[in-house]
Amino acid sequence: MKKLLFSAVSLDIGGIENALVNLLNYLARTDKYEITLFLEKKEGIFLDKIDKKIQICVYCPNDSKVIILRKGINFIKQTMFKMKYKNKYDFSCAYATYSKPASFVARTASKNSCLWVHSEYMQMFDNNKSKYVEFFEG
């Protein structure tokens, strides 16, 4: 059985979230995959629509206003995540590409990772290619 990981911010209302739930439930019905969904916030109207076979985990970065505290805590969280999950999955996908934590989770969990692009990112970064590249390279 192949192990798949998907990461997102939450399952709040929206097109990306609805598409993710539909994809996960479709994959779960095939019984070919062990699926894990990492969320930054375990909340949203689609949460109860997720198939019971899908494991839901939380990876929530610290957002303290005290920069040194935030960076220290997040460094520890990232290190612990890497120790536990680095390359443990056959495939991983950051389904919320606007989220650096979701991207980190997917890039760490598998050598075969992808970023689901559901937006026009060059517009988000005012057509500044260096900002665009910096965002996606982490």
Where in this protein do the model-derived segments appear?
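Membrane-interface segments of envelope glycosyltransferases acting on lipid-linked substrates or membrane lipids
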Residues: 1-138
